[in-house]
Amino acid sequence: MNKTSVPSIDSIDRQWYLVDAENQTLGRLATEVASVLRGKNKASFTPHLDTGDFVVVVNADKIRVSGNKPQQKLYRRHSGRPGGMKVETFTHLQERLPERIVEKAIKGMLPHNALGRQMFRKLKVYKGAEHPHAAQQPKPLQLDPAATAQ
């Protein structure tokens, strides 16, 4: 009888990937990136281990959503104080902090526990085309062509 092999933490080979978010649909980009962060693109995927790779997302300020979402999609946060609820539309948040839109979409697709927080730390999002991770030589990650907004 064959036994299932579980990769050790030392044997996990982490790659760096670069994703250009320009003219990409938010949800379709987020699902692909979340899958790579979890390690589901590897043969050594194990649900209870962080086998994922690092992902650098650039041009977060040029991400797209469909329909009326730019005016109707709301992002909520709370300061923890009474009356501390803040509500912002997609358009306003994109002008102020475009990285947060991509981060929030991807974080919601990762496990909601300590392992998910560890996976989320491997995500790096930047609003422009520049990023400080050139030394890691990130490879371009090919996304599904359907993810490109028309």
UniProtKB/Swiss-Prot annotation:
Signal sequence extent: none
Pfam families: Ribosomal_L13 (PF00572)
A Gene Ontology cellular-component term: cytosolic large ribosomal subunit
Transmembrane annotation, as ranges: none
One Gene Ontology term of the molecular function aspect: structural constituent of ribosome
GO biological process: negative regulation of translation; translation
SUPFAM superfamilies: Ribosomal protein L13 (SSF52161)
Region annotated Disordered, chain positions: 129-150
Superkingdom classification of source: Bacteria
Family as reported in the entry's similarity comment: Belongs to the universal ribosomal protein uL13 family.
Protein task: This protein is one of the early assembly proteins of the 50S ribosomal subunit, although it is not seen to bind rRNA by itself. It is important during the early stages of 50S assembly.
Designated name of the protein: Large ribosomal subunit protein uL13
Organism name: Synechococcus sp. (strain WH7803)
